[in-house]
Amino acid sequence: MGLRSCTHLATLFMTLWAVAFCFLVVVPIPAQTTSLQNAKDDRRLQELESKIGAESDQTNANLVGPSFSRFGDRRNQKAISFGRRVPLISRPMIPIELDLLMDNDDERTKAKRFDDYGHMRFGKRGGDDQFDDYGHMRFGR
């Protein structure tokens, strides 16, 4: 009888543990859902304010300000969300650092192929002594 009650308690404990885990992880908590809703509202407000700021001057934005004052107070009351909020900044698709990493030899190859007068150079075996001042090849010497 002792072994049966022990297994009964173990299965009961595992069942309660699974229910508690599902309740904590799967079921949304009202505080989390309200913080998500607040985050969505803040994002919409930020988009609206950026559109209004782009279309009108700062003085006009101050006239429109009282209609947004109640939303401004809500930002201070925001609960802790799941992560740090990243500001929306317009960035180029290719990072600026990539320009430093990419090595475009177009300017160098053009400088090697043509001289100051636009004449084509046909080789670099002899160095600069191979060409005269006008870009023509020297033979001999």
Swiss-Prot record:
Chain positions listed as propeptide in the UniProt record: 32-73, 86-111
UniProt signal peptide: 1-31
InterPro entries for the chain: Gastrin/cholecystokinin_CS, Sulfakinin
Positions where Sulfotyrosine occurs in the chain: Y117, Y134
Residue numbers bearing the Phenylalanine amide modification: F82, F122, F139
Keywords from the named record: Amidation, Cleavage on pair of basic residues, Hormone, Neuropeptide, Secreted, Signal, Sulfation
Pfam families found in the cross-reference section: Sulfakinin
GO biological process: adult feeding behavior; adult locomotory behavior; inter-male aggressive behavior; larval locomotory behavior; multicellular organismal response to stress; neuromuscular junction development; neuropeptide signaling pathway; positive regulation of cytosolic calcium ion concentration
Highest taxon of the lineage: Eukaryota
Biological function: Drosulfakinin-0 (DSK 0) plays diverse biological roles including regulating gut muscle contraction in adults but not in larvae.
Family as reported in the entry's similarity comment: Belongs to the gastrin/cholecystokinin family.
Protein's name in the database: Drosulfakinins
Gene: Dsk
